[in-house]
Amino acid sequence: MEHFRELFEMSQKENKGLTFWIGGQTVGGGVLKFNAETVEVKSQQYRRVIIRISAIDAVAAM
């Protein structure tokens, strides 16, 4: 979680997007907020997406 947290904070502060891999699918977006259990992101397609951190397989900075 600590490595994910670093990317979440970077995305939130710098308004940079991340790509999340979840069960073989990808979701892209910028972090709005996060806590110990979830991360909330927005994208061009969706205004609000809430992802369970326990479901995330990988995260990459765009």
State each model region's role.
Residues 1-28, 35-38, 42-62:
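Short glycine-rich, low-complexity segments
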